[in-house]
Amino acid sequence: MSSRIDRDVINALIAGHFADPFSVLGMHQTQAGLEVRALLPDATDVWVIEPKTGRKVGKLECLDARGFFCGVLPRRKNFFRYQLAVTWHGQQNLIDDPYRFGPLIQEMDAWLLSEGTHLRPYETLGAHADTMDGVTGTRFSVWAPNARRVSVVGQFNYWDGRRHPMRLRKESGIWELFIPGAHNGQLYKFELLDANGNLRIKADPYAFEAQMRPETASMICGLPEKVTPSEERQKANQFDAPISIYEVHLGSWRRHTDNNFWLSYRELADQLVPYAKWMGFTHLELLPVNEHPFDGSWGYQPTGLYAPTRRFGTRDDFRYFINAAHAAGLNVILDWVPGHFPSDEFSLAEFDGTHLYEHSDPREGYHQDWNTLIYNYGRREVSNYLVGNALYWMERFGIDALRVDAVASMIYRDYSRKEGEWIPNEFGGRENLEAIEFLRNTNRIIGEQVPGAVSMAEESTDFAGVTRPPETGGLGFWYKWNLGWMHDTLDYMKLDPVYRQYHHDKLTFGMLYNHTENFVLPLSHDEVVHGKKSILDRMPGDAWQKFANLRAYYGWMWAFPGKKLLFMGNEFAQGREWNHDASLDWHLLEGGDNWHHGVQRLVRDLNHTYRHHKALHELDFDAYGFEWLVVDDNERSVLIFVRRDKAGNEIIVASNFTPVPRHDYRFGINQPGRWREILNTDSMHYHGSNTGNGGVVHSDEIESHGRQHSLNLTLPPLATIWLMREGE
């Protein structure tokens, strides 16, 4: 029996207050021979076993009835592989001792994690099934530098924090432990004695899978295999590509009619994916799928940044959905939330008893609008956690793009704050320099590590250079949502047509700054909630005029420079606001052909026509790709412009935003010849009045608008038409 183990040490171990379990537990060399110590609550008998022979080589004596065992093997001097035969409740179990294994994290990994430069921290931290010294199990590691003790608790140890206290790697603040026998599918958490002596139970920040709310445990789950993007997927994100995005909330796109329950990832793969393909969209954008506790946050308050939500199935089911989208030729964009996280006790908030992931001062670390906490981007381990997450989704799931939510709230310290409620940066300014550097670094790493993948910014201010390279002072995003265009055009469209002539600039102003960024034109989920009404319901007039206005607006939007984004339901003119707790109003498309079918057909035709003609997308961000033909006819609310591709092919776009047909409307053109009407939002095919130009019109050598040749058209009421030059 050992006399060297102090009673206070045993008490501290059993009470869960001992920070260095490996200094006591496991096998140790002593003058009397090898000494084996184990903490095995509720055990009654413990033997040391030699695995090769199965022979008992020594019995451990119970030094404390609460489960501390110790024994000396006097004839042994060199460490050897051993097992423990433990009797619990009259039944003997053969186990491998977690405390006989050496350090898990390599020194280089520990150094990179501490420096915040480990590109893929998720390959080291978290829970990873592994085999060590011939023993299968799971290695656990978690960053909690200020905790006094950390244990792994889970289904494999009765959720008992005494059984598996972890080793602290002081140089990095990471706790680690290999637990033999712990396997994929088992639930676990980390139990911490925090910096203040309080007990905390935390989910794993790096968990690859988690329980569905209201449960909060993490799940042991293997790291997904890497996904290699195809050349076609890489090209589909380029600036000259047609990009038409269908924005979807997976929980409310469609539901089971019998119980209003969600569709699974696999059901969505079978229903949503072919629908989006049929509609002609090029990209699917998913509202956040990271695990989150509150349905009403729509995923924008995530607690499991590395775990796809279990609401719709398993992690592998989600991969199945992504693969189905790719097989259908759809790229997938994931809404990504690196700006803030909820204050739920089981998550990142005060993780080790200190403000580890967030700022300690609420003027920097608390988001008043959303009652959430703000990441401390200046802490290297925190920014590393987030940058690694971006790579994780792209490399391990094949996500083609990330849309970063609420960028303005990240880059401005005074965002939504009054004077005295925020702290200036080191230079006295309002910019969050650490957040700006984090975004630049993330975008740089995406570009270097995942060729063809891109990022998009929802940035609501006039911050200069969101889509410009960091070396020129930009943030390095590929695309930025044009929220200014969206607000201006919706403000215009909601006006009674009689008043539109006084607000003509709302449609033209966007071109004054159009080439300052690479823009996406978004009609997103944010525009159909919180009392804003549906897009259809914002249109003025009676029912016929509402639909006509909407069709004209869509025709304008799809032709205007910039990539396109449409939230689900808008493609068939849903009449009510979006409700995340219910399905879209698919019943509007039941029965006979109606106005909703007309809008749906229009959006489908817009997508396919837009994709087919390079003039509509190839030079979105080049001044050569756009030219006004009629910009000043505010009295009749008529606007006409040309879209152009690199080869000089032109498409003419003409919009009449009044209910008065404009017959014999003459305007100058660049290229004389025969022009075909390839799209008319007033067509009877879309349930319009079918006013138009009979398919083909020829130019006249009559000067107009400063040009030698002109066209004489009929402009339908509340409509947009597209014309393509067919020849001389």
Swiss-Prot record:
Reaction catalyzed: Transfers a segment of a (1->4)-alpha-D-glucan chain to a primary hydroxy group in a similar glucan chain
Catalytic residue positions: 405, 458
InterPro entries: A-amylase/branching_C, Branching_enzy, GlgB, GlgB_N, GlgB_N_E_set_prok, Glyco_hydro_13_cat_dom, Glyco_hydro_13_N, Glyco_hydro_b
EC number(s) from the headed UniProt entry: 2.4.1.18
Pathway(s): Glycan biosynthesis; glycogen biosynthesis
Subunit structure: Monomer.
The family this protein is said to belong to: Belongs to the glycosyl hydrolase 13 family. GlgB subfamily.
Protein name: 1,4-alpha-glucan branching enzyme GlgB
Gene: glgB
